[in-house]
Amino acid sequence: MKISYDKEIDALSITFKETTVTTKHIAEGIAVDYDSDGVVSGIEILDVKKRLGGNDTFKQVVLEGVGLELAA
């Protein structure tokens, strides 16, 4: 999974897998990408700071149960 933020256009992108997609706009500024089997492969949210409550809220990112493995 890849999470990226483009501060120039204030867009958050979450990619679950890299593949050829069909994009469906589900609401103003929110798009969901589907793979050929209809499984969600990504999500894009525009105007993310406004949607999440501004800079202070957006800066607080919590990863739960991600299962990160650290190299020894």
Which sequence ranges carry the predicted segments?
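Small, basic N-terminal interaction modules of short regulatory proteins
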Residues: 1-72
